[in-house]
Amino acid sequence: MKLTYVLIVAMLVLVVCRADCFGRGGLCTWFDPSVCCSGICTFVDCW
């Protein structure tokens, strides 16, 4: 049950990060998704 919750939260973070950082440059971080590049965001950076 806890694993499912973690996966749902992780997906939400990725979606929010992608929507917020589209077209930007830099790193995508867990704490500051506004600093990110466009593309697929991970918890470390963007591709």
UniProtKB/Swiss-Prot annotation:
Signal peptide: 1-19
Keyword Signal: yes
GO molecular function: toxin activity
Tissue specificity remark: Expressed by the venom duct.
Main location: secreted
Post-translational modification: May contain 3 disulfide bonds.
Record's subcellular location: Secreted
Coiled coil: none
Superkingdom field: Eukaryota
Keywords: Disulfide bond, Neurotoxin, Secreted, Signal, Toxin
GO CC, one annotated term: extracellular region
Domain comment, as recorded: The cysteine framework is C-C-C-CC-C-C.
Summary of the function given for this chain in its UniProt record: Probable neurotoxin.
Similarity annotation: Belongs to the conotoxin O1 superfamily.
The protein's name in its UniProt record: Conotoxin Cal6.18
